[in-house]
């Protein structure tokens, strides 16, 4: 195994964890603009709390190598839902960011599983 793979995997995972932790904060203490977006997409007023909890869980799971694949998988599911929501509502300007984070989550998932396999 490439010796830099665990370093790359960990670094990317921690950056992704930071994204999800900041996202959780932003969804827990939602701005008026984001609340309006959730309403326009048809979600109930409390749904941003569900998003915040899921993003918090993904962020925390990404920190430790043992739980990293679960965090990356959960993050990928959350971002797939966000991408699908924006695309189905033709809100294309908001579709790019969750799509990129979905891709990064899948890369972290693949890298973390490769590192885990190589360690065993």
Predicted regions and their residues:
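Interfacial helix-start motif at the membrane-water boundary
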Residues: 45-53, 57
